[in-house]
Amino acid sequence: LVVRQQSDAQGQLGLGSGWLTQHAALNSQIALRIRTNESFHLINDNRPVICIGNGTGLAGLMSLLHARTRQDYTQNWLIFGERQREHDFFYQSTIEAWQTTGMLQRLDLAFSRDQEEKVYVHHKLREQAQQLKAWVDHGAVIYVCGSINGMASDVDQALIDILSEAAVDQLRQEGRYRRDVY
């Protein structure tokens, strides 16, 4: 579980992140319910997957990647963005181990605050446009998980610019473009 405390412009904490960071005792049990996103389930075959996300969205992508590694499916590409590598590279040892063992064929990281000019996941998509096209041509399924504000729309636009609007619409219709954004 990855939790980052969120607040609105007035400083009001987010309902879930505020409760978890301010009221839930560390290592205590809490009652919760899991709400399934029916459109974000993992495919049941060995087609390549491209996982794109930022922040706490990595948790959703990690569940997909864990399932694929258990089945020895290695055509996995993770494009992940956060603020600072030193503080925000969640699951770093697991991700690096997957890369070393070949379970993660590609890894592109975008740490927006580690350099003067901010770099986000949509920039990484654009940098890797030819690879993206090749993976999609080989049947890749694209999963996007994370911020609805900013990241999700920027990724949408990058995909449209790289692949075309018609191609992205076709991916959606075929169930090859799946999102869990919040």
Mark where each language-model region is.
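Reductase modules of NAD(P)H-dependent flavoproteins
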Residues: 1-40, 69, 73-182
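Active-site beta-strand/loop microenvironment that shapes enzyme catalytic pockets
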Residues: 45-68
